[in-house]
């Protein structure tokens, strides 16, 4: 006993439309492609977040960390005040007051 695909015919005025029901499931390749694409997006998101944190840490280290302290010490040894104009009053030194 063989079954053939079911066709539905609709006739209105002068138009005849024949519709055949589609397959109920997609091929597994569609699911695999969707999963691989979402994994790729997730990996790229992780890389971007790690890069952002790395750049932020470099900024903080150069602004407030050891590098900034060395720059301040070198500037004080040379007698230069970093980021200040000549007319401003003296600023707080990084050294302990006497």
From Swiss-Prot:
Native species: Equine herpesvirus 2 (strain 86/87)
Subcellular location: Host membrane
Span list, region Disordered: 1-26
Parts of the chain that traverse the membrane: 29-49
Low complexity bias spans: 1-21
Main subcellular location: host cell
GO (cellular component) term, any one: membrane
Gene for this chain: 28
Disulfide bridge positions per record: none
Keyword Transmembrane assigned: yes
Keywords, in A-Z order: Host membrane, Membrane, Transmembrane, Transmembrane helix
Name of the protein in question: Uncharacterized gene 28 protein
Bilayer topology term: Single-pass membrane protein
């Amino acid at each position: 006993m063989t079954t053939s695909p079911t066709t539905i015919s609709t006739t209105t005025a002068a138009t005849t439309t024949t519709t055949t029901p589609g397959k109920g499931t997609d091929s597994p390749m569609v699911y695999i492609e969707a999963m691989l694409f979402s994994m790729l997006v997730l990996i790229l998101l992780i890389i971007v977040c790690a890069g952002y944190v790395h750049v932020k840490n470099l900024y903080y280290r150069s602004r407030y960390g050891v590098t900034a302290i060395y720059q301040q010490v070198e500037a004080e040894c040379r007698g230069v005040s970093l980021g200040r104009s000549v007319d401003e009053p003296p600023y707080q030194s990084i050294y302990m007051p006497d």
